[in-house]
């Protein structure tokens, strides 16, 4: 009897995770200038200027990376990618934003927990410092998950005094 139950569990509907999620064309500026591709590793946008070159390259080469990774699908969620946050073509008004202070921005870049304002809706929030996107947080209401890439986090606990120039041009 136990083996039959295991077999039934293993015969779950494999199409369950293949629900088609629409590609969010409003995430980038000038949407008519972008082509979108849904792959196993995520959803990518490539500017139409480079699309013919990519198509030609894929005929004879293994393309490792092309375009901007917009996000990845996890269950029914489309999780925005860090590269989207850093893309100069990001349409920032599409997402709720949280402007961070210098101290909060450093905490975010250390991948530490920060508190988001109660006025923000649940879901993915673009965090910015002086109007420049740093990345994403997922607002769960009572707390927020820091989605900054683990391998990019600041490991030093030292905060320079007197210089609050996190971003300089």
Report residues per predicted region:
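Polybasic, low-complexity RNA-engagement segments
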Residues: 1-169
């Amino acid at each position: 009897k136990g083996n039959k139950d295991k077999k039934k569990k293993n015969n779950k509907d494999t199409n369950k995770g293949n629900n088609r999620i629409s590609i969010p064309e409003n995430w980038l500026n000038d949407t008519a200038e972008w082509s979108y591709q849904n792959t196993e590793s995520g959803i990518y946008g490539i500017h139409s200027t480079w699309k013919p070159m990519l198509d030609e390259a894929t005929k004879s080469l293994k393309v490792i990376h092309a375009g901007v990774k917009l996000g990845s699908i996890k269950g029914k969620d489309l999780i925005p990618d860090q590269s989207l946050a850093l893309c100069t073509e990001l349409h920032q008004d599409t997402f709720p934003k949280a402007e961070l202070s210098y101290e909060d921005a450093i905490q975010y870049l250390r991948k530490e927990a920060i508190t988001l304002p109660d006025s923000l809706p649940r879901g993915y929030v673009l965090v910015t410092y002086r109007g420049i996107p740093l990345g994403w947080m997922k607002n769960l209401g009572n707390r927020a998950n820091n989605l900054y890439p683990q391998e990019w986090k600041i490991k030093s606990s030292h905060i320079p005094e007197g210089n609050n120039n996190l971003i300089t041009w």
